[in-house]
Each structure stands twice: as structure tokens, then as C-alpha cells.
């Protein structure tokens, strides 16, 4: 299958290409970048040297239509709206890695992004790209919108608890820690100001909250509100979500593990962490770098009736490019693990 990547110069575009060059069923036929037209891909993405001799092209819808069966859009938020619409109208399959088609309600974009979506009639054409929740819809989709990195990491831990009415849906608090690559590849804070930090950002109203609320509300069949507070930490890749919930059913630990096994036992990219010995007693993003896994665990605070659901992932993999490739595999009928059979890198 022939694929293109629009916006291939950033971290997410580069990670998507890293996975595509090793995919057994894919040929990369076109990559675009506004600022690097004519340059060899490996000069901007040095890790790809020796894997491809492609050069960056200008964005040209006719060429993309002629050369590609499927296109990944890895451009900044707000930029993808017109690109996705143009490709959709030409009948191309699209996997969008921006936030522009994640939310299905115009009012939600007004609330979380502060802008009016220019094509609200296209929002319901998009399928939210979490195969563990929407696999059958993704199989039939023309447009899949990949989730935000913190959103998918959190919701995979919370979804079984919501679906089975285990927790109080009025009191869910998500505490997220994320590495610096989550901020993108643009010039940012100097190393002296970024190194060693544990820095809150958007402790209220982070836009990924809207995705979590959308998906959990759909599962619950009622409106759910979530409190979410992210923190930037001194790692390059990785997310840890500490999801604080309060139980409305009496359940023992073994019953909760059974519930998670029933939900994710057949899933290729969800691992349940419950070791009593060793270093890895709870999910830890350090042991996920370079992989598409989301690791889930929990602990019980019986004194306060609190269930702490823990989840971790690599924000550039399960939180972005890995999910994109997984969605492509589902859309196109490939083995879901094609191009994603990577064990995590350790040590890092």
C-alpha cells in the first residue's frame, strides 16, 4: 500500500516514518514539509539515513491523490482542518495526528480550543482512533483521528471502571506527567530552564480533558466531567497518568484484576502490571520507550474508598505515531502488530 506523510519534519512525523520504513505492507511515496522542500528526508530526520532517499515535496493534493492510498497528517493543530477536508473529498483514507477532528461537537472546540471549527459537518465523519475502544468503527472509516497522548493513556485505565459502574463518575482526577517531546520539536525553553523540572502546565482546562470526557461519557451513556492536571518532567519520552477515582461498589483486588483481564486480555498493546517483586510493581514509562504498549495497574486505598488506576505509555508511540500505525493496520486489514513489533528500549 502506498502512503504519504504530510508534515514529516517534526517529532510525530519522524516517528511515524520510523515505523513506516519497517512496515512489511507499506511503501512511502510522498512526504511534505513547507520549510524543507527539496531537501533529503534524512537531513531533517537523521535516524532515517540509509532507509530512504525521499526528498520533501510541497503540499499538492493532486499529487497526493495520484501517489497515495492513505495519508497521515502530522501538522500543527488548526492546520489540518483544510488538508483533511481536501483529502477526504478526494476519497483518500486519512489518519490525522492533529487535534482538529478528535472532538465530535462544535461546542467542544469552542470550549477546549477557543476557536470555531471551519468544517463542523466533517466532525462526525471522523472516528476516534483508539482500536481498544472503537475497532469495528475504525475498520470501516475513511478518516481516523488519533487521540491525544495523555487522553489515550488515561482513558484506557478508566474505561473498564466506567463501563462496569465501579467508580463515582462525578469525582475523577487525572494527574499526568509527560516528557519534553510532548511539546513538539519547535524552539522552546532553554535547556537550563527545562532540565530537572517537575513543572505544572495548564493545571486546569487542559484540552486533552475534552477527549477524555467525550469518550468516557459515550461509554457511560451520560455526561462525565474529569479534572486533569498535567506536569512537564525531566524525561524526553513518556507519560504516567495517576487516575484518582472513588469506588461506588465494594470489590476486592482480585475482582478488579479479573475485570481488567476480561477487558484487555486479548489486546496486543495493553499490558497489565501487577508484580509483587522487582522494580516494575506499577506502570512506569521508563520501561515503555520506543514501544506501542500502554501499561495499566492500580492500587487500593481502602481507608478512603479510593481506587488509583495507573497507566503509562510512550507519548510518541501509543500517544501518537504508534497509534497511527495501529489504526492504519485496522483500517486496511493488516495484522494489528505489523510495523509495531518493538520491545521497549532499556536502559534509556
Swiss-Prot record:
Catalytic residues (positions): 149
Molecular functions per Gene Ontology: N-acetyl-gamma-aminoadipyl-phosphate reductase activity; N-acetyl-gamma-glutamyl-phosphate reductase activity; NAD binding; NADP+ binding
EC number: 1.2.1.103, 1.2.1.106
Metabolic or biological pathway, per its Swiss-Prot or TrEMBL entry: Amino-acid biosynthesis; L-lysine biosynthesis via AAA pathway; L-lysine from L-alpha-aminoadipate (Thermus route): step 3/5; Amino-acid biosynthesis; L-arginine biosynthesis
UniProt subcellular location: Cytoplasm
Catalytic activity: [amino-group carrier protein]-C-terminal-N-(1-carboxy-5-oxopentan-1-yl)-L-glutamine + phosphate + NADP(+) = [amino-group carrier protein]-C-terminal-N-(1-carboxy-5-phosphooxy-5-oxopentan-1-yl)-L-glutamine + NADPH + H(+); [amino-group carrier protein]-C-terminal-gamma-(L-glutamyl-5-semialdehyde)-L-glutamate + phosphate + NADP(+) = [amino-group carrier protein]-C-terminal-gamma-(5-phospho-L-glutamyl)-L-glutamate + NADPH + H(+)
InterPro entries in alphabetical order: AGPR_type-1, LysY, NAD(P)-bd_dom_sf, NAGSA_dehydrogenase, Semialdehyde_DH_NAD-bd
GO cellular component: cytoplasm
BP term (GO), one: L-arginine biosynthetic process
Family in the record: Belongs to the NAGSA dehydrogenase family. Type 1 subfamily. LysY sub-subfamily.
PANTHER family: [LYSW]-L-2-AMINOADIPATE_[LYSW]-L-GLUTAMATE PHOSPHATE REDUCTASE-RELATED, N-ACETYL-GAMMA-GLUTAMYL-PHOSPHATE REDUCTASE, CHLOROPLASTIC-RELATED-RELATED
Function field: Involved in both the arginine and lysine biosynthetic pathways.
Protein name, entry field: Putative [LysW]-L-2-aminoadipate/[LysW]-L-glutamate phosphate reductase
Organism this protein belongs to: Nitrosopumilus maritimus (strain SCM1)
Gene: lysY
